[in-house]
Design a protein with these regions (language model features):
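Generic N-terminal helix/loop capping motif
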Residues: 28-35, 81, 106, 110-113
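Short, compositionally biased low-complexity segments
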Residues: 1-4, 71-79, 122-129
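Long, hydrophobic/aromatic-enriched structural stretches that serve as scaffold segments
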Residues: 52-96
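Charged, low-complexity surface segments at secondary-structure and domain boundaries
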Residues: 2-15, 83-88, 131-141
């Protein structure tokens, strides 16, 4: 996403702090997101992408309708107190990033919930029509989980 849409140039936050925020957010998200480990997911694409165009659907002789897939906008607000930001600008080791971490975890969980359970306009992996299910056994013994997964996909 471009810095213009993020408003970074208008922000009182310096480049060093933006790098810390970006690095922290990406590290936390990568450690939490499960759906992106199972599927090839793209994004984020920025605020301007609201839908993806699909193939036109013919609804009559010489009549077709453009189909599109609406995209979810997943977000969570958080606050870093101005005094904390000012203290970081003076001494870079003194910033409490827990609000950012909490918000990042919330966004990652929302994304995974959409991937697995879906939403009002799109099914998830566990709720789609025709989804296959398999019974799992007790995974406390080594190798049982692997065996269950192999049996489920073969």
């Amino acid at each position: 996403m471009s810095d213009a849409l993020l408003g970074r140039d208008d922000s009182p936050i310096g480049e060093e702090l933006w790098q810390v925020l970006d690095h922290t957010m990406l590290d936390v998200a990568r450690g939490e997101l499960v759906g992106r480990r199972l599927l090839e997911l793209d994004g984020p694409f920025g605020l301007g992408l609201k839908q993806v165009s699909l193939a036109d659907e013919e609804v009559g002789d010489g009549v077709s309708i453009a189909a599109s897939l609406p995209l979810a906008y997943v977000y969570q607000t958080f606050v870093l107190p101005g005094r904390d930001i000012a203290a970081f600008e003076r001494e870079p080791s003194s910033l409490d990033l827990s609000p950012l971490v909490t918000a990042t975890l919330a966004v990652a969980r929302k994304e995974d919930d959409l991937v697995f359970r879906g939403g009002e306009h799109a099914p998830g992996l566990l709720t789609a029509t025709g989804v296959l299910r398999a019974r799992l056994s007790d995974w406390t013994s080594v190798g049982v989980a692997q065996g269950d997964l192999i049996a489920a996909v073969t």
